[in-house]
Amino acid sequence: MTYHFSVYKHTLVFKESELLTRKFIVLKDERGDICAFTDFHKYISSSKKSYIRRITDDGNNRHYYVAKMLNYVFFDKYHIDTLNSITIKMVSDFLNDYGNCILPNDNCERTKSTVISCVKTIIDFLDQFISENSDKCQIKQEELYKTITIRNKRGKMIKEKVPAFDVTYSGKIKNIFRDMPNKVFDILINHVIRKHPDILMLVALSSFAGLRPAEACNIRRTDSPLGPGIRFVIQNGEITDVILDLKKELNLRSDLKPVGAIKKERIQRVYPVFLDAFVKCYKIYMAYMEHHKYEAEYGALTVNKQGKAITYDNYYQKFRKIVEELIPILLANEDAEIVNYGHLLMENNISPHIFRHWFSVRLTLYGEDTAGLMYWRGDNSPLSAITYLQNKGELEKQYRYVNSMLFDFMSWQADIEYGGGK
């Protein structure tokens, strides 16, 4: 019988509608059945250097980093019986194998930032474990890390723990393919309107309000008993603003299944230039939903065939099928740029995040500064905004400058078929 460590997620509802997810590291057998729960989760601290954390903090990816390290030292390369037996060589070997993508049964390519996140998580985890088991551990804290003083993103001098040994990474980074010409965007969104209107608002929320795909899955209908997820501001009979509620991750399904994480809890608005396009999409979608069921007691905006709120995983799989349908459409086009993009899609994978990238490129070309991009994208860090602004010159060469007149892509066929957009 072989075993491995895995992450188990338990979800419950508190305060009547808010979702609370807790992760545990469990031991599973070769059939995937849980044999035992461990207490390793108690050594996994929040990524924020704070004495307290939000009750909704689920640990993000930290549990997965730790589970991978535990499998490495208990089963894959070394065969220790207790974590007290871990040595600094084992830790160093794991982090370097992880950084160079040569772990057993794991050849994933990783970015430098992902490797850094893993290193920090493992150091914090072992630091906490050693502190509580110092009389039993073979490894000492001074062997594990040293404390240095660095300047953070805001220019403030802070202390940070870094490994006391060298960690390398391969640098063989696979570039993420996210570019999408406006012509292709028009074709794609019209294809969604005609063939897949069930995910139209997920596309619109990312393209016109900058929401992350998983965040878009959290948006509720205007009549949701949990509170309106969308509010339309109307002045003199005209919609002048659309406000989106992302303040809390709520339970939107009768089976308690989370639909996706909200990375930054906030109130978000549709970008003004895209207001008309967003409203057109909304009208088309709501006309479509008149003939489809949904769980009214939760009021999720986007639902699956069973009427339950769509999850990010379900959205991702559906999007991949749409891309497969899109490729022959692009290849049959008479425009050389569109045909070329079709060939690129045959060689590169894209995900629903491409709509948020399209949104970010448009805002950069519209002249938004760092603060503006951070606000409209819902970012905590300025790094992404700075990257877009640093590449603005190249973006201006690559894309034509577009104004609000771009958004006449709502074809009359779609308006007739679904009764929206007028």
Which residue ranges define each predicted feature?
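Conserved tyrosine-mediated DNA breakage-rejoining catalytic core shared by Y-recombinases
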Residues: 219-281
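Catalytic-site neighborhood detector that most strongly recognizes the C-terminal catalytic loop/helix
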Residues: 377-403
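C-terminal secondary-structure termini that scaffold catalytic or DNA-interacting sites
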Residues: 404-422
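Flexible interdomain linker/hinge and immediately adjacent N-terminus
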Residues: 135-184
